[in-house]
Every structure is written in structure tokens, then in C-alpha cells.
Amino acid sequence: MNRILFISLYTATLCTFLAGCSSDNWAIHAMPSSNQAADMLAGDLTTNQNWYLDESRYPQLTVPQNVRPCCAFGDMQKVKIGPVPVPFFRLNNVVELEEIGPHKFASGIYHYTPSSSSALGHGGSENNGILYTQKGGFIDLAHVRDTADDTMGLFFEILANLGQAHRIDLPAELGPRYIEMASFDASSLTDEQRWSVAAHLSARLAYFKAESHEIAQWHGYASFSGWPETISAYSLEDLYSNMLGAKIVLNLIQQHKMLSEREYNQNVSLLLNASLQELGVVDKSQSKLVLAAVDGKWWNSHESIPNKYMVLQRHYDLGDIQTPHRLTPELLGKENSNLQYLAQSPAIVLTLPASVESLDLDNIAKLVLEVAPSYADNFNHIPKRIWSERIEHTQFPVIAKYAELQDGQEMKALDVTEK
């Protein structure tokens, strides 16, 4: 959960006037080869060969610089600005499937898509929020969409530079963040294999970018000065949602269903909704009941945003295998027996392959997070032999485990209950 929706306090009115139209920021076309044209003319033959993409026509996409506001875990939370409670305000996070709006690449805080450009049968904003699924636990739609867009934003640059030493700069948090691509012999890869390797690298690195954000939040990074984001660090639904976004766009890239922004936006919208249905999404009233059932266990409704320990349960298990936090019969207990039917489905565990075409992906590209001196003291709980000013994504799981130990000690000292 990387941007708390406190900005809704002052953007709700403004957003009404920020309606715009979708536009194609990129549109490329596959080309038939001369052999395919000759075969067609000579014998009216059809071919199963894919048309090719001219590298000189690759769009100059980048990772989006603007990010979506996302949800603090819980429902109808109170908010404080400094020591002052915001009167008569509660943060309403929960949405349901029918309310989800059309996707927009790099939408930032707000974007309106007209119905003529939408594949969902209706226009509107993305209308992000959280919802509960029986097989995937809570899903934060802003996290899904951000990592989806990061995957898309990385793909063509990775594809164009595959096999070469290359650096891709990312928005800074704690310090510079970037992707280091290593030089290797890619001459034996076919065009289809290069496409597949680049697609998997893009999804994997976009996901690790999300992991680096969780680390940055825990160690003091904040999007807005004076508004701490420690409440959001390692929130239990974040990384599963991020990986879902990476997998959605990995699937679209593999099927070449993202060659224009319009096509990309429409297909993300369709596959996101289909994925939520497969995960067993419930309606808004049921999601609210689930949040109420885990109040005092996973979050504390008596605390206000941005108090870190409004969130009681966190997810520190980083890596390319993500298991969701879901209801269990034991968690619900007798007092929530009416929700036991939501705790019966098996979990869907998400994974991102570590190797493709016999290539170890971590050996050919790494995500790097550098720590500026102003944040170095926030890493004092971690032995120096484990971290340095430069942290690679393969070290992220160890960094997170030290955060888990530190949080456990703080919660015990504060007598904060975590069940």
C-alpha cells in the first residue's frame, strides 16, 4: 500500500473536473515478411508464422512516474493530520467487481475513460479500492494496476537491449533505483525467444520494483513530506496484488495483445475482471463483513491513519512465490460463523518463473535500490554484512525479515495485539 488515500480529502471535488479522453500514446503494427506475402500470392497459402516487429518502431515507453493512490488496509478508517483528527471523515476503501472502471496506462491520481474507449461496456475512472476474493484474499486494485503498467513500461526497452549491458533508471526512493542489465550472448535466441525472455524479465523486475517500495516505506520514505507511510509497509495484500498485475501483463505481452495503448488498456481491463472472478471475488457487503471479522486481528479500527500499528498483520515473505492471506475457520471463530463459507476454497498461489529459455533471469538483470546517507540510520537494525548502500533485489527477502523482527519487538513493547 504505497500511497494512502488521504489525498481524497482535497481532490474529491477537483477530480470531478479532470475528465479527459483516452489517447493512444503508442501504436505499433506487426509486419508480414516478404516470404509470407510471396507464399500467399503463389498458392493462396496461409501460414502460422507470426508477423514481425521492426525494432526501429518500438515505442519509447518508460515506467510511469505518477502512481495511483491506494488503500490503507481496513474500512471506514479515521484519519489524523498530525495530532488533529479529521472530523466527520471516514476512508471508504471497498469496491466490488461491477464498480471497477476501465484501465488507463499511467493514469496517476485520476483519469476518465469514455465508454467508447472502454471494453467493459461503461466509461469512468478506474475506481480503485480493495475487495476480498475467496482464493486470493484481499486485492488492492491500485497495486495491481501500477505493477501492470510498470511491466508494460519496461518491456520494449528490455527487449531492445537484451544481451547488452544497459541501465534503466526508475523513480528514486530512499536513493536511486535502477535496473542493471548484464551483457550475455543472446545470438542463439530466436525472435520469439527474445520476446519471451524480455516479457518475463519485465514482469519479474516490475514486481521487484514493488518489493523495493515496501522496503522504502518501512525505512522512512514518504511520497508527501510529513505524512509517514510506515502504516503501508508490507501490508498483507500488497505484494500478491502487485504480482497479479505483473502476471496479467506478462500474459498480454506473450499474446501480442498490447501493441497499442488502447488495446493494452482494454485487455488489462478484461483480464483483470476475469482474474478477479477466477479468484472468487465477493460483493462489497461481503468484503466489508470480512474486514469487520478481522478487525482487532489484521487491523485496528480504533486507531487512525497514519498510525503504523493501525495495521496489525503484515506480509514479510518476499520473493517470486506469493501466497495470499485468507480467512480460515480458526481466524473466524464462532462469532463469525456466518462467514465460514468464505473460508472453504483453496488458495491460488502466484509465481513468476526464475528462468526462461534456460536463462537464469536474476543473472541477466537486477533491480538495485541505493540508500542515501539521510536514510542510512534507518538500517541500523540490520548487520552491516547484510546490507550496504547498494541493495540488489535478491537481498530483499532478508531485509524484510529484519523488519519483521523489529516490528515484533516494537509491538511487544507497545503492548500492541497481533493475533
Descriptions of predicted regions:
Residues 1-9:
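Bacterial N-terminal signal peptides that target proteins for export
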Residues 8-17:
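Bacterial N-terminal signal peptides
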Residues 226, 241-248:
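Long, internal stretches of domain cores in catalytic or enzyme-like folds
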